[in-house]
Amino acid sequence: DQDCLPGWASHEGHCYKVFNLDKTWEDAEKFCTEQANSGHLVSIDSKKEANFVAELVSQNIKETRRTDFVWIGLRVEDKRQHCSSEWSDGSSINYQNWIEAESKKCLGLEKQTRYRKWVNFNCGQPYRFTCEI
């Protein structure tokens, strides 16, 4: 596995970090891009990666009333679509784990599913988030 910056966790050539900051989806994505070259909100490409991210979030989230939800790098770009065609890092969606398909536009992981299912929330709400580089 690749060497990660201090405080980042390594998994299959990528580095991940949960940030206990409340940000809107767009601000969280911008924050991730500022952490390192190629940084973005986390994209989840397999069940194995989903399980890794779920464990990382569970272990690193600081408990507050806002920690029931954590942004991932997926946003609905068009009300007519159920999902956008790509993650915020530009990679295509080849693994999916939706819990419901409403058009609240931005997706994240929900505590009551042990951070394993993708749930739609309003992009403008501030929540914790996970970055990947």
From Swiss-Prot:
InterPro entries: C-type_lectin-like, C-type_lectin-like/link_sf, C-type_lectin/snaclec_domain, C-type_lectin_CS, CTDL_fold
GO molecular function term, any single one: toxin activity
Name recorded for this polypeptide: Snaclec A7
C-type lectin domain ranges (all copies): 11-132
Cysteine disulfide links: 4-15, 32-131, 106-123
Primary role: Interferes with one step of hemostasis (modulation of platelet aggregation, or coagulation cascade, for example).
Additional remarks: Shows greater sequence similarity to the alpha than beta subunits compared to other heterodimer snaclecs.
Protein species of origin: Macrovipera lebetinus
Coiled-coil intervals, chain numbering: none
Subcellular location, principal: secreted
Tissue specificity statement from the Swiss-Prot or TrEMBL entry: Expressed by the venom gland.
